[in-house]
Amino acid sequence: WLAGDEPAAIAIVARRGSAARLAAFALRPAWRGKGLGRKLMQELLMLLQQQGIETVFLEVIRDNHAAVALYQSLGFTRRYGLCGYVSTELLPPVPGVLQLYPTLSLLRRAIEESNSQLPWLLDPLTFATLPCQVVTLEQRAFAVLTTAGSRPVLSFLWVEPAARRQGLARELLMALAQQFPGLGTSVTVPETFTPLFAAAGYTPLSLQQYEMTMDLADA
């Protein structure tokens, strides 16, 4: 959005079929506190609805109470509390425990099962176009490591349905910490997984978010 020739606000939207994610929304400082954020968000949501978008997702920092209140007033509801974790225990590496696995082979299996029930940034579709590698423990538990930065980031865990509730996810997290000291996640993991990460020696990050969603069909 422009005020004359000067940018006043910006929104970045990612699309995935009939769903969209508000990847970024920002106002220049001079335009804040004037009700413009609400007005522009209403315009954006109307535009997305006209383009056939049915559901909109976004993430917001939990402590940003003003932003949370704004999104709630527009009709967004909290879907997940999101946390991040980092491995803090120094464990000696054990070679050969983890093996590489074809990325697309895992994603095809995980996409079929997830059925859009995960947070947007954890949906397996996210990783189909990102630089990443997959490692596996016993060909039953799998981890996606994104490799766009200087060090890998743990971005996704998946255990075969028949192998769940056997401790494999915890074993995989511990093996990852051994092979990649200091490995962490982004703030994209549902907070219900905190006990799992704690049991594997990972510490929660201080930053926390909400994923919020809005059904435009009800708007």
Language model: regions and residue ranges:
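Conserved beta-strand in the GNAT
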Residues: 6-14, 21-26, 138-158
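Active-site acidic-Proline motif in GNAT/NAT acetyltransferases
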Residues: 15, 28-30, 34, 62-63, ...
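Conserved acetyl-CoA pyrophosphate-binding loop and the N-cap/start of the following alpha-helix
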Residues: 31, 35-43, 163-175
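Hydrophobic alpha-helical segments and helix pairs
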Residues: 37-78
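Conserved GNAT acetyl-CoA-binding A-motif
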Residues: 48-59, 178-192
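Conserved catalytic-core motifs of GNAT/GCN5-like acyltransferases
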Residues: 59-61, 72, 77-90, 203-216
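Amide-forming acyltransferase catalytic core, primarily the GNAT-like/NAT-type
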Residues: 74-146
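Flexible loop/N-cap segments at domain edges
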Residues: 134, 154-166
